[in-house]
Amino acid sequence: MSNRRLAPTVLALLLALPLAARAQGPPRLVLMLAVDQLRADRVGPELPGGLGRLVREGRWYPDAVLDHAVTETCAGHATMLTGRHPGATGLTGNVFLDVEAGRRVYCLEDAPERAGVIGVPGEGRSPRNLRVTTLGDWMKQVRPATRVFAVAGKDRSAIALGGQHADAAYWFSEEHFVGWTTSRHYAAELPEWIHAFNGVNPPKDGFLAALPERWEHLPETAQGAEGPDDFPGEAGDLSRTSPHPLRDGDLETFAEQLFASPWIDVVTLDLARELVTREGLGRGDAPDLLGISLSGNDVVGHRYGPNSHEARDALLRIDAAFGGFLDFLEAELGKGSVVVALTADHGVLPLPEWLAANGGSECPAENGRSGLKRMGLGLLWNLYWKFSPLSWPESWLVFAGPTIGVKRALARDEGVDVADVVARTKRHLEARPAVAHVWTRDEIENGDGEFAALYRHSYDPERSGDLVVQLAPTCLISSYGSGTTHGTPYLYDRAVPLVFFGPGIAPARIPGHAATVDIAPTLAHRLGVPTPEGLDGRVLFE
């Protein structure tokens, strides 16, 4: 072969070297996708869109769980990119307890004068209550050019995914129909492109203008459904059957209807697409991080249950919308440029009526439902007549989800030992059929067995109060006579999907234990980013 004929071949090889080196380097974008209340048994390779593609082409952990007991949104989201259990993150639930002040604290609240929510007077939000750092913080420490953004329907989801030093976190506010917003912890004003996305005169412009008048179920929804569309126990104020109102009433009513449908999740992905374009994510000198949480799926599940036509329709729409978003990322940044982790913050209990009809109820309480108001009033009167019958009636307790704290100031004023109030409260609640156990601080800190470990992972001595209530399996305590919820240590609340997808990640189905706390160390390992000492999670694969 002559030198003249060899030269083009050598030149082609030399030109290919930077591309090969870039392909072996870190991805351009890390995407953390959380689907609120997505049970593990809802996701599989049969889904035709983006979620199904992740399972088919990614590394799938079908037995993944939350490794903590109090399975709520704030706690679950905070485990994903910190690698720490809720007891360490400080975000033990959607609200936590300040027993000294005798009040509940929203998990990511902050002073309005320091971190006021734009457009919502008197409300402040920031990661101030998060005790630890996240993957985005670690990435920025190694490569300061890294940018970190998060977007979600719920403020707590976006802020928890963004971490301590996010460039911005955006969420949807129903109040006064603010639309998509942020807090002044991140920026003094919203960027113009967010204003344009919200619209100057909604619903005539902005994202609302593109929404249909009604939420009508897809034809394929009924094909994969597990029962009739109208099922006992479903919430009926926005219709128990297709179609459901979506643009009926004033703007605040629009917002409520939107959040009770899969359209809020479709819009979240639309906003994320706009964010990627406007901020140029994945186009810098360092990998960027984008956290997305799809919050509407949770509201749909609460209202109609995970086996409903509504939940099935929401899943199909999310699957399709995320498929389009993933195609967009690959078209913009190139195939092999994005690493994705998929999980959920918790699962959910099926409707008690559905369990009763299908032979799945284990709850000793009648109908599987117990009234929160009746149970709570009985307890409070019990304590009042025992400890302060001559004083003005006042609750001795403050509640945050399943956690209970005794008000310290009241106990001091009445000369009552806190331990006596704790013991009486425990006896009263454990006599109720719907309650399996009421955990004391000592039992949590020193107990043996799986449940003790799970509650220990959820427990923060400064924020979890004095008692934690464990309901009996499949029991539901609620103020409502319809819908369902989550928050227990049982697998229907703890089993979540977990999938990793991207360059260098071979398709595989990996049985066995994995947890949401494993996501951050696994992604950090793939990025070559050092992690803090003392993480609760582990690297799942090389």
Where are these regions (language model features)?
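Active-site His/acidic residue clusters
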Residues: 159-168, 243-256, 260, 283-318, ...
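A long, amphipathic alpha-helix that forms part
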Residues: 258-284, 297-338, 422-424, 428, ...
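Bacterial N-terminal signal peptides
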Residues: 8-18
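Secreted, luminal/periplasmic, and some membrane-associated catalytic domains
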Residues: 72, 94-124, 162-164, 168, ...
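Short, structured active-site-proximal loop/turn typified by the sulfatase FGly-forming signature C/S-X-P-X-R
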Residues: 41-90, 95, 145-151
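Non-catalytic, well-ordered alpha-helical segments in soluble enzyme domains
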Residues: 40, 53, 132-141, 401-439, ...
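Active-site regions of oxyanion-processing enzymes, predominantly non-cytosolic
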Residues: 146-152, 158-159, 220-226, 265-299, ...
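Long, low-complexity, polar/charged, intrinsically disordered or flexibly structured peripheral segments
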Residues: 204-274
